[in-house]
Design a protein with these regions (language model features):
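Register position in tetratricopeptide repeats
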Residues: 62, 96-97, 130-131, 157-165
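Helix-start (N-cap) detector for alpha-helical repeat units in TPR-like alpha-solenoids
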Residues: 50-51, 84-85, 118-119, 152-153
Length: 165
């Protein structure tokens, strides 16, 4: 009997990395509830997997579950304070929950990590717009477009503010 248990434990250990790899793959490649379940499984197996926290947070944002997304982005940041995508995502989730000031702090941190990131300038432009800081919003939307001319969110932002790109 003990030999059977030993063999079973060894087989379980051999299969564990493959199961984790499958969960991570689905977490990254799938969307919606399937991705959320896969990310949750990946995190059950490896609670320090920042990629799975960020991916699950993104899926929560897509579903409008901003409190859950903020919690996951925050955990990713706690584990790796250099994760640009976690600061960007959390900034957007804060904006969507009416916490633009907190979002602004995350956008500022993201720009410290990557000073010429079009996506972050676009996001900060939206945050400034929500805060009523029109001139700052215009400047950031223009900066985003200078870095990435196809940044539609910045074009739309300028149009809402009555400014040409």
């Amino acid at each position: 009997m003990s030999r059977f248990v030993t063999v079973w434990v060894v087989l379980l250990a051999i299969g564990a990395p493959a199961a984790l790899a499958d969960a991570r793959k689905d977490c990254f490649e799938k969307s919606g509830d399937i991705a959320i379940r896969a990310c949750t499984e990946a995190l059950r197996r490896d609670p320090r997997d920042t990629v799975s926290y960020v991916n699950r947070a993104f899926e929560y944002v897509q579903k409008g579950q901003h409190a859950q997304s903020i919690a996951d982005y925050s955990k990713a940041i706690e584990l790796d304070a250099g994760r640009l995508d976690a600061y960007q995502g959390r900034a957007w989730a804060y904006l969507k929950t009416g916490k633009a000031e907190q979002g602004l702090a995350d956008a500022e941190r993201a720009l410290q990590l990557k000073p010429n990131d079009a996506r972050t300038f676009d996001m900060r432009g939206h945050i400034y717009e929500a805060l009523g800081r029109r001139d700052d919003a215009v400047a950031d939307f223009r900066r985003a477009l200078a870095l990435e001319p196809r940044m539609q969110g910045s074009r739309d932002g300028l149009q809402r503010l009555g400014v040409k790109p």
